[in-house]
């Protein structure tokens, strides 16, 4: 019954064309639209705008910019601290943000961080992490003093790898919570949201009460929401009435003592025009997607089913100089800068995505939210990019050299203002078609795609500047 919203995607985009005025306008729009909603909405100030110094995003959001937000009653703290190398090296701006938010909740983002580096990260003030992919990693971070959010979204699914460890060592459960970290409305419709995580944990052997605590009181305590998360005197009457606790079959929902009518019509607010028309691409042409190597070797982003981590590979495709052409094993990926029309385009190769006979593209690509596209031919990839320029953002799928469908996301290229049903139908249709075109069932076509541009998750990513090695902190050059 409450959501803790890290607004970094909005700030990444809004700042580029409207400064703090645009960010403020967005905040006012959301809070006003949610005022009558049966949901408590809280905000984390974005810590990582940009996520790293070598990102090509729309803005900087400094500690000085944060001061006007810090004491707002709905602001709980600092959003996930993405660039842990900056914390370890005590980079000036991130240390100012950590100091500003001392005493508040500070979320983390530390995939694979361990040992002395983990201790230094925690000692800097970071309190949570949601990037654990194994119980061993989660346990080490918990013992270092962190609270752990076990993630189960559309792309990254970690409950099955972590919960069995908690069942064996239940003394750690009080320090664990659940999150989704990007989940398609299509998957929410089919599976549920946090209730799906609870349901899955119970099936993996966790006591139902422990699983429910991870979804309720543990989260409320972590984020300092003292009147939420329990059924007791002095707590807000946010309740679920279940038909079956084992299967988490929800009969009724109460928010602040009021029963929620699940059949009531949802009113979609008209978004201010100032929050639209934010996709600004330089002179883009199909030739910008050409990828050649002087020695015939290429770096490859190997995608993994059920994860958003990648594996770094280098493959020899030619005996000498050559231009890459996609095949059954390797497809092309590109990221096109869309905030300031710089004309920058990074091009690379992926394996494991599998799409054949077309291309898929999105203006949602963490964290800078440039346009990202994967395809098996340059013409369809270019068509996908042009389609998103035309719609000023969205998800699109190209099949057989034609636009199969597009879900427009006109609000900063990140969100739809057309309502749930419209978005759900469009997205479902494209996801099903993408799987028909070869995308494996273990990969969420649009969400997994969106994480390929996030240069703080190992091992290898792509930005408008090119292929980036997260482990070495270097861009590859051909």
Describe these PLM feature segments.
Residues 2-3, 34, 98-101, 121, ...:
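A generic structural signal for well-ordered alpha-helical segments
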Residues 4, 189-205, 209-478:
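Active-site microenvironment of metallo-dependent hydrolases
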Residues 12-17, 76, 80-82, 123-124, ...:
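Short, basic, glycine/proline-bearing loop/turn elements
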Residues 18-20, 49-54, 85-87, 113-118, ...:
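Flexible loop/turn segments at secondary-structure boundaries
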Residues 29, 60-150, 157-178, 187-210, ...:
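Histidine/acidic residue-rich metal-binding segments in metalloenzymes
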């Amino acid at each position: 019954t409450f959501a803790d919203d890290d607004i970094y995607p909005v700030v990444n985009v809004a700042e580029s064309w409207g400064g703090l005025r645009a960010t403020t306008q967005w905040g006012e729009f959301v809070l006003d639209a949610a005022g009558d909603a049966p949901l408590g909405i809280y905000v984390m100030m974005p810590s990582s705008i940009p996520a790293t110094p070598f990102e090509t995003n729309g803005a900087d959001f400094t500690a000085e910019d944060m001061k006007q937000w810090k004491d707002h009653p709905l602001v709980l703290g600092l959003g996930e601290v993405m660039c842990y190398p900056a914390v370890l090296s005590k980079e000036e701006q991130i240390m100012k943000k950590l100091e500003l938010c001392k005493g508040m909740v500070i979320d983390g983002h530390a995939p694979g961080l361990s040992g002395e580096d983990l201790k230094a990260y925690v000692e800097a003030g970071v309190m949570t992490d949601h990037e654990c992919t194994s119980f061993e990693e989660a346990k080490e971070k918990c013992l270092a003093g962190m609270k752990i959010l076990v993630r189960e979204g559309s792309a990254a699914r970690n409950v099955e790898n972590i919960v069995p460890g908690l069942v064996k060592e239940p003394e750690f459960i009080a320090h664990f919570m659940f999150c989704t970290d990007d989940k398609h409305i299509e998957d929410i419709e089919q599976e549920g949201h946090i209730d799906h995580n609870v349901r899955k944990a119970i099936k993996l052997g966790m006591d139902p009460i422990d699983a429910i605590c991870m979804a309720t009181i543990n989260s409320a305590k972590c984020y300092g929401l003292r009147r939420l998360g329990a059924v007791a005197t002095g707590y807000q009457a946010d309740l679920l009435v279940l038909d079956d606790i084992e299967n988490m079959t929800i009969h009724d929902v109460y928010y602040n003592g009021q029963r929620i009518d699940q059949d009531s019509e949802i009113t979609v607010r008209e978004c201010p025009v100032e929050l639209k028309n934010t996709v600004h691409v330089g002179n883009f042409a199909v030739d910008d997607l050409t990828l050649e190597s002087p020695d015939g070797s290429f770096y490859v982003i190997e995608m993994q089913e059920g994860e958003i981590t990648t594996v770094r590979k280098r493959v020899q495709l030619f005996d000498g100089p050559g231009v890459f052409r996609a095949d059954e094993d390797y497809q092309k990926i590109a990221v096109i800068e869309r905030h300031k029309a710089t004309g920058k385009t990074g091009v690379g190769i992926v394996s494991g995505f599998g799409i054949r006979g077309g291309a898929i593209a999105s203006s949602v690509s963490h964290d800078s939210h440039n346009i990202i596209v994967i395809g098996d031919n340059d013409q369809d990839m270019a068509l996908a990019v042009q389609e998103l320029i035309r719609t000023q953002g969205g998800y699109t799928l190209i099949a057989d050299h034609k636009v199969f469908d597009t879900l427009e996301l006109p609000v900063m290229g990140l969100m739809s203002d057309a309502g749930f049903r419209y978005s759900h139908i469009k997205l479902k249709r494209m996801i099903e078609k993408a799987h028909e075109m070869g995308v494996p069932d273990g990969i969420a076509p649009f969400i997994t795609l969106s994480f390929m541009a996030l240069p703080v998750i190992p091992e290898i990513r792509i930005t408008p500047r090119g292929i980036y090695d997260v482990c070495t902190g270097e861009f590859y050059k051909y």
